[in-house]
Amino acid sequence: EARVVDLCAGSGAIGLAVATETTCTEVWAVEKEAEPFALACQNRDAVGVPCLHLERGDATDPATLAHLDGMVDVVVTNPPYVPADEMPTQPEASADPHVALYGGSPDGTEIPARVARRALTLLRPGGVLLMEHSPSQEEAMVAIAAQLGMTDIATLPDLAGRRRFLSARAPESTKPTASVTQ
Protein backbone atom coordinates (compact mmCIF):
# COMPACT_ATOMS: atom_id res chain seq x y z
CA GLU A 1 0.00 0.00 0.00
CA ALA A 2 1.43 3.34 -1.07
CA ARG A 3 1.36 6.36 1.22
CA VAL A 4 0.91 9.76 -0.43
CA VAL A 5 0.81 13.17 1.25
CA ASP A 6 -0.55 16.33 -0.38
CA LEU A 7 0.91 19.39 1.37
CA CYS A 8 -0.82 22.76 0.89
CA ALA A 9 -3.85 20.85 -0.36
CA GLY A 10 -6.26 23.74 -0.92
CA SER A 11 -9.58 22.29 -2.09
CA GLY A 12 -8.11 18.78 -2.02
CA ALA A 13 -8.18 18.32 -5.80
CA ILE A 14 -4.73 16.71 -6.07
CA GLY A 15 -5.26 14.38 -3.12
CA LEU A 16 -8.69 13.41 -4.45
CA ALA A 17 -7.24 12.69 -7.88
CA VAL A 18 -4.55 10.45 -6.39
CA ALA A 19 -7.05 8.68 -4.13
CA THR A 20 -9.57 8.03 -6.92
CA GLU A 21 -7.16 7.18 -9.73
CA THR A 22 -4.91 4.72 -7.90
CA THR A 23 -5.55 1.51 -6.04
CA CYS A 24 -4.19 0.47 -2.65
CA THR A 25 -3.22 4.03 -1.76
CA GLU A 26 -3.68 5.93 1.50
CA VAL A 27 -3.64 9.69 0.97
CA TRP A 28 -3.24 12.41 3.59
CA ALA A 29 -3.94 16.03 2.62
CA VAL A 30 -2.91 19.00 4.76
CA GLU A 31 -4.37 22.49 4.48
CA LYS A 32 -3.83 25.42 6.86
CA GLU A 33 -6.57 27.84 5.83
CA ALA A 34 -10.14 27.31 7.09
CA GLU A 35 -12.10 27.96 3.88
CA PRO A 36 -10.12 25.68 1.55
CA PHE A 37 -9.97 23.00 4.26
CA ALA A 38 -13.78 23.05 4.58
CA LEU A 39 -14.03 22.79 0.79
CA ALA A 40 -11.61 19.84 0.77
CA CYS A 41 -13.80 18.09 3.35
CA GLN A 42 -16.91 18.76 1.24
CA ASN A 43 -15.17 17.50 -1.90
CA ARG A 44 -13.96 14.32 -0.19
CA ASP A 45 -17.43 13.62 1.18
CA ALA A 46 -19.09 14.32 -2.18
CA VAL A 47 -16.75 11.94 -4.00
CA GLY A 48 -16.89 9.38 -1.19
CA VAL A 49 -13.21 8.55 -0.89
CA PRO A 50 -12.53 6.79 2.42
CA CYS A 51 -8.76 6.54 1.87
CA LEU A 52 -8.33 10.35 1.81
CA HIS A 53 -7.48 11.67 5.28
CA LEU A 54 -7.68 15.44 5.74
CA GLU A 55 -5.76 17.37 8.38
CA ARG A 56 -5.99 21.06 9.09
CA GLY A 57 -2.54 22.35 9.90
CA ASP A 58 0.63 24.06 8.74
CA ALA A 59 2.29 21.95 6.05
CA THR A 60 5.72 23.15 7.21
CA ASP A 61 5.23 22.35 10.91
CA PRO A 62 7.13 19.22 12.03
CA ALA A 63 4.18 18.31 14.29
CA THR A 64 1.83 18.05 11.32
CA LEU A 65 1.58 14.37 10.30
CA ALA A 66 4.57 13.59 12.54
CA HIS A 67 3.29 10.00 12.83
CA LEU A 68 4.16 9.57 9.13
CA ASP A 69 7.76 10.84 9.31
CA GLY A 70 10.02 8.63 7.20
CA MET A 71 7.14 6.48 5.93
CA VAL A 72 5.69 8.36 2.94
CA ASP A 73 6.24 7.15 -0.63
CA VAL A 74 5.25 10.34 -2.46
CA VAL A 75 4.71 13.96 -1.40
CA VAL A 76 2.81 16.11 -3.88
CA THR A 77 2.43 19.83 -3.36
CA ASN A 78 1.24 22.97 -5.05
CA PRO A 79 2.41 25.44 -2.39
CA PRO A 80 2.11 29.21 -2.55
CA TYR A 81 5.03 30.06 -4.86
CA VAL A 82 4.27 33.16 -6.88
CA PRO A 83 7.13 35.72 -6.70
CA ALA A 84 6.16 39.05 -5.11
CA ASP A 85 6.49 40.97 -8.39
CA GLU A 86 4.68 38.41 -10.56
CA MET A 87 0.96 38.46 -11.27
CA PRO A 88 -0.67 35.05 -11.75
CA THR A 89 -1.95 34.69 -15.31
CA GLN A 90 -4.31 31.74 -14.83
CA PRO A 91 -7.95 32.93 -14.73
CA GLU A 92 -8.76 30.61 -11.80
CA ALA A 93 -6.05 32.30 -9.70
CA SER A 94 -8.03 35.55 -9.62
CA ALA A 95 -10.39 33.99 -7.06
CA ASP A 96 -7.60 32.68 -4.82
CA PRO A 97 -6.61 34.57 -1.68
CA HIS A 98 -3.16 36.18 -1.54
CA VAL A 99 -1.97 33.62 1.05
CA ALA A 100 -2.66 30.77 -1.39
CA LEU A 101 -0.59 32.31 -4.16
CA TYR A 102 2.48 34.22 -2.99
CA GLY A 103 5.57 32.36 -1.79
CA GLY A 104 6.55 34.57 1.14
CA SER A 105 9.68 36.20 -0.32
CA PRO A 106 10.61 38.42 -3.27
CA ASP A 107 11.47 35.39 -5.44
CA GLY A 108 8.55 33.34 -4.06
CA THR A 109 10.69 30.41 -2.88
CA GLU A 110 10.53 30.85 0.91
CA ILE A 111 7.39 28.77 1.41
CA PRO A 112 8.30 26.14 -1.23
CA ALA A 113 11.72 25.72 0.45
CA ARG A 114 10.07 25.16 3.83
CA VAL A 115 7.59 22.71 2.28
CA ALA A 116 10.43 20.81 0.58
CA ARG A 117 12.25 20.54 3.90
CA ARG A 118 9.13 19.18 5.60
CA ALA A 119 8.51 16.80 2.70
CA LEU A 120 11.99 15.39 3.12
CA THR A 121 11.27 14.43 6.73
CA LEU A 122 8.01 12.76 5.70
CA LEU A 123 9.53 10.75 2.84
CA ARG A 124 10.93 7.27 3.23
CA PRO A 125 14.43 6.73 1.79
CA GLY A 126 13.99 6.89 -1.99
CA GLY A 127 10.55 8.53 -1.69
CA VAL A 128 9.60 11.15 -4.28
CA LEU A 129 8.73 14.84 -3.97
CA LEU A 130 6.65 16.41 -6.76
CA MET A 131 6.19 20.18 -6.44
CA GLU A 132 4.66 22.83 -8.69
CA HIS A 133 6.61 26.10 -9.00
CA SER A 134 6.93 29.11 -11.26
CA PRO A 135 9.03 28.65 -14.40
CA SER A 136 11.17 31.54 -13.12
CA GLN A 137 12.07 29.42 -10.06
CA GLU A 138 13.45 26.37 -11.89
CA GLU A 139 17.11 26.94 -10.96
CA ALA A 140 16.30 28.01 -7.39
CA MET A 141 14.11 24.97 -6.74
CA VAL A 142 16.76 22.59 -8.11
CA ALA A 143 19.33 24.29 -5.85
CA ILE A 144 17.04 23.98 -2.81
CA ALA A 145 16.50 20.27 -3.43
CA ALA A 146 20.26 19.77 -3.85
CA GLN A 147 20.98 21.70 -0.61
CA LEU A 148 18.60 19.32 1.18
CA GLY A 149 20.58 16.35 -0.12
CA MET A 150 17.87 15.11 -2.45
CA THR A 151 18.80 13.03 -5.48
CA ASP A 152 17.48 12.41 -9.01
CA ILE A 153 16.51 16.09 -9.17
CA ALA A 154 14.71 17.18 -12.32
CA THR A 155 12.24 19.79 -13.49
CA LEU A 156 9.37 18.73 -15.68
CA PRO A 157 7.31 20.71 -18.18
CA ASP A 158 3.61 21.47 -18.02
CA LEU A 159 1.38 20.90 -21.07
CA ALA A 160 2.57 24.22 -22.55
CA GLY A 161 6.22 23.16 -22.25
CA ARG A 162 7.05 25.47 -19.31
CA ARG A 163 9.29 23.87 -16.67
CA ARG A 164 6.98 24.13 -13.65
CA PHE A 165 7.41 20.92 -11.66
CA LEU A 166 10.21 19.75 -9.41
CA SER A 167 10.79 16.03 -9.06
CA ALA A 168 13.32 14.89 -6.47
CA ARG A 169 14.05 11.77 -4.45
CA ALA A 170 14.85 11.49 -0.76
CA PRO A 171 18.34 10.08 -0.26
CA GLU A 172 19.04 6.88 1.63
CA SER A 173 19.43 9.03 4.75
CA THR A 174 16.46 11.41 4.92
CA LYS A 175 18.11 13.89 7.28
CA PRO A 176 18.65 17.23 5.48
CA THR A 177 22.31 17.86 4.75
CA ALA A 178 22.03 21.62 4.93
CA SER A 179 19.72 24.28 6.17
CA VAL A 180 17.82 26.06 3.44
CA THR A 181 17.72 29.79 3.98
CA GLN A 182 15.96 32.39 1.96
Model region roles, listed by residue range:
Residues 165-182:
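C-terminal lobe and adjacent flexible extensions of AdoMet/dcAdoMet transferase-like proteins
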Residues 22, 49, 69, 96, ...:
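Short, well-ordered coil/turn elements that cap or connect secondary structure elements
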Residues 32, 80, 105, 133-135:
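Short strand-turn motif at the edge of the Rossmann-like AdoMet-binding core
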Residues 7, 104, 157:
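Glycine- and other small-residue-rich loops at beta-strand/loop junctions that grip anionic moieties
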Residues 1-87, 114:
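Conserved SAM/SAH cofactor-binding pocket of Class I
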Residues 80-111:
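Mobile active-site "lid"/loop adjacent to the S-adenosyl-L-methionine
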Residues 108-168:
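Conserved Class I SAM-dependent methyltransferase catalytic core
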Residues 10, 160-161, 173:
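Short strand-connecting beta-turns/loops that link adjacent beta-strands
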